[in-house]
Amino acid sequence: MVLFGLGRLFYVILLLINAVAVLSEERFLRRIGLGRSNDETPVFGQDQNTTKSKVVQLIGAVQTLLRIPLIGINILVIVYELLLG
Amino acid sequence: MSALFNFRSLLQVILLLICSCSYVHGQWPSLLDRYKNHEVLGAFWKMARVGERASPYVSLACILMAISQFNS
């Protein structure tokens, strides 16, 4: 990578975001009680402030927001690694 | 081609492939289901299936890879 430290940091961040985004909702998250539908139904428009609901919201947001861009970024990184190592 | 001969880079490439295949399968299922029984392209469907079924282990592997990338 061109920028030595930042390239490594980029890989680390990419892998960590991937680690959150692969967790499948219906097979894993719902079983351990972190699924979005498993969340105690909040009162209309009111945010819950427990840690668990924050984690659930974070995982859900990452999955809905970042999955489609991650496809492209992953494929770019794969092609880069295969061609230039 | 050096990613194929360096074990850690190969592992990283496989992990990223599993991740992106499972995203593609979640988003557009017919794209990968079409090649389910294909000899070569069926591998992508298999990787998508691995990413769906074994997602906690894939996620753990991603975190471990990030840690090892961070330390090296």
From Swiss-Prot, chain A:
Main location: endoplasmic reticulum
Its membrane topology: Multi-pass membrane protein
Localisation: Endoplasmic reticulum membrane; Golgi apparatus membrane
Keywords, sorted A to Z: Endoplasmic reticulum, ER-Golgi transport, Golgi apparatus, Membrane, Protein transport, Transmembrane, Transmembrane helix, Transport
Family matches, as Pfam families: Yos1
Endpoints of the signal sequence: none
Outcome of mutating N18A: In YOS1-1; impairs interaction with YIP1, blocks ER-Golgi protein transport, and causes a severe growth defect at 37 degrees Celsius
GO cellular component: COPII-coated ER to Golgi transport vesicle; endoplasmic reticulum membrane; Golgi membrane
One GO BP annotation of this record: endoplasmic reticulum to Golgi vesicle-mediated transport
Transmembrane segments: 2-22, 65-85
Family, per entry: Belongs to the YOS1 family.
Subunit comment: Component of the YIP1-YIF1 complex, composed of at least YIF1, YIP1 and YOS1.
Task of the protein: Required for protein transport between endoplasmic reticulum and Golgi apparatus.
Listed name of the protein: Protein transport protein YOS1
Swiss-Prot record, chain B:
A Pfam cross-reference name: DUF1242
Family: Belongs to the KISH family.
Swiss-Prot/TrEMBL keywords: Endoplasmic reticulum, Golgi apparatus, Membrane, Signal, Transmembrane, Transmembrane helix
InterPro entries: KISH_domain, Ksh1
Keyword Phosphoprotein appears in the UniProt entry: no
Phenotype of null mutants: Inviable.
Compartment annotation: Endoplasmic reticulum membrane; Golgi apparatus membrane
Residue intervals annotated with topology Lumenal: 27-53
Record GO cellular component, one term: Golgi membrane
Membrane-spanning parts: 54-72
UniProt KW Transmembrane keyword: yes
Organism phylogeny: Eukaryota, Fungi, Dikarya, Ascomycota, Saccharomycotina
Gene that encodes it: KSH1
Annotated organism of origin: Saccharomyces cerevisiae (strain ATCC 204508 / S288c) (Baker's yeast)
Primary location recorded for the protein, binned into one broad class: endoplasmic reticulum
Bilayer topology annotation: Single-pass type I membrane protein
Name assigned to this protein: Protein Kish
